[in-house]
């Protein structure tokens, strides 16, 4: 008798995705981050439900409702900090997942890659709106500054900002709609994840060598179902260590002060995972130019398949490209640091140089060095 997992309409889908899925035999721990992102999304949705039961999206009570969750709700503090620090874990896994895609040339699967970029934008939008909800000082001023960037759009900018705000400033209407969007976006993210996986399973996974591995495939279960839980264990251990020992390590002290439109914080900045893009935005003196650079800092990923000039897919056997890749990583860390610094000398010039290096590396140096490596293959 044929196994039910191979015949039942629903079980068949799960079987082809998680059990009998042909996977390359040589994929490393860098391929774990997809499932870790799934785990992060699950943690975020579950903790979000518990928080949404007690949170009120009103400017008068939002801050005190978050305080109430931490003080009066049974284990509310751990749920709140699991959600806040879970977002940080989510972005760490996202950045490593994207970095792995760049290093090993996974962007050549253009449909999967482009859906991934949409996912990145959706998760960033979700995280930004979530940061506004506690209605602390940084929530309010972060929302004001970031939404105000849309006013740089010619002709419709000012009307667009007021339409998003629901008035002439960030107020109750803004908070209510941000809560609604923050609630619905993770489900859109989950739907996009399904499309992402659908396109991935059309082509099969890439592997560290970048060479087609159809001749050497192994079933996902048991070989990789036994490897994935190790990543889960490490991620949850790291998250719980952060939550139980230093829950406010990655937050901003200003967000423990209730929002006050009459008092501007000395230094407005977003969460740490947006600082690299924020530094690029600030490095350009022109408002519209800054906004375009901000969008391009993420949208540049869509150009990766077009900028791939190498005859080899992966960077595994390309030492010059490897060097440039790690310079890019160092540059992004530098931008993250600069984004958290005040706008003064020497941080302004460092930010401008780091922003220039970021775009110059991706648009110019990496494609040229790939062509040089092609020539070296003939030696």
Curated annotation (Swiss-Prot):
> Mind telling me which GO cellular component terms the entry cites?
mitochondrial inner membrane; respiratory chain complex III
GO process terms (BP): mitochondrial electron transport, ubiquinol to cytochrome c
Enumerate the InterPro entries for this protein: Cyt_b/b6_C, Cyt_b/b6_C_sf, Cyt_b/b6_N, Cytb/b6-like_sf, Cytochrome_b, Cytochrome_b_C_euk/bac, Cytochrome_b_N_euk/bac, Di-haem_cyt_TM
Where does the chain bind a ubiquinone? 201
Q: Where are the transmembrane segments?
A: 33-53, 77-98, 113-133, 178-198, 226-246, 288-308, 320-340, 347-367
Matching entries from Pfam families are given as: Cytochrom_B_C (PF00032), Cytochrome_B (PF00033)
| Secretion signal span | none
Positions binding heme b b562 in this chain are 83, 182
The residues that hold heme b b566 are 97, 196
Q: Which UniProt keywords apply?
A: Electron transport, Heme, Iron, Membrane, Metal-binding, Mitochondrion, Mitochondrion inner membrane, Respiratory chain, Transmembrane, Transmembrane helix, Transport, Ubiquinone
Is the Repeat keyword given for this protein? no
Subcellular location(s): the record lists: Mitochondrion inner membrane
Identify its protein family: Belongs to the cytochrome b family.
Q: What else is known?
A: Heme 1 (or BL or b562) is low-potential and absorbs at about 562 nm, and heme 2 (or BH or b566) is high-potential and absorbs at about 566 nm.
Relate the assembly described in the record.
The cytochrome bc1 complex contains 11 subunits: 3 respiratory subunits (MT-CYB, CYC1 and UQCRFS1), 2 core proteins (UQCRC1 and UQCRC2) and 6 low-molecular weight proteins (UQCRH/QCR6, UQCRB/QCR7, UQCRQ/QCR8, UQCR10/QCR9, UQCR11/QCR10 and a cleavage product of UQCRFS1). This cytochrome bc1 complex then forms a dimer.
Q: What protein name is recorded for this chain?
A: Cytochrome b
Q: Which organism is it from?
A: Ochotona rufescens
